[in-house]
Design a protein with these regions (language model features):
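Small beta-barrel nucleic-acid-binding modules, primarily SNase/OB-fold domains
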Residues: 1-131
């Protein structure tokens, strides 16, 4: 994300986890986010910095919680292992409800019978790497 001063920031969307490149539905998820962010002014609410130096943030466009929208549209999972420790309760409830809705409607990545969560995909990739 580029700020109003022209500085670029690496941002990780707070409390969601999207499919990794090479994983089913990754391109659709990425492209959906790109469409939302292209030529849009977004409000960034930084909550933390992760171990990779990325700003962890909520993104908003015209009042729309983009992170929540990614979950609602089946483009990401609610990252509950982190969220249950850090996310405000009202946001946690909204994100959990959005994921339940997307699952029930078989929206986006939930159209697959048993989509593999990105954290499990990463673990598989790490385990498959020769030591």
């Amino acid at each position: 994300i580029t700020d109003t001063d022209g500085r670029k920031h690496k941002v990780r969307l707070a409390y969601i986890d999207a499919p990794e490149i090479g994983q089913a539905h990754s391109i659709e998820s990425r492209d959906r986010l790109r469409r939302i962010l292209s030529d849009e002014t977004v409000d960034v609410q930084v909550t933390d910095t992760d171990r990779y130096g990325r700003e962890v943030a909520y993104l908003f466009s015209d009042g729309l919680d983009i992170n929540l929208s990614q979950i609602e549209n089946g483009a990401a999972w609610h990252y509950t292992s982190i969220a249950k420790k850090q996310q405000p309760k009202a946001d946690f409830a909204a994100y959990a409800a959005a994921e339940a809705y997307a699952r029930a409607e078989r929206t986006g990545l939930w159209a697959r019978r048993e989509p593999l969560a990105p954290w499990l995909f990463r673990k598989q990739q790490h385990t498959a790497q020769p030591q």
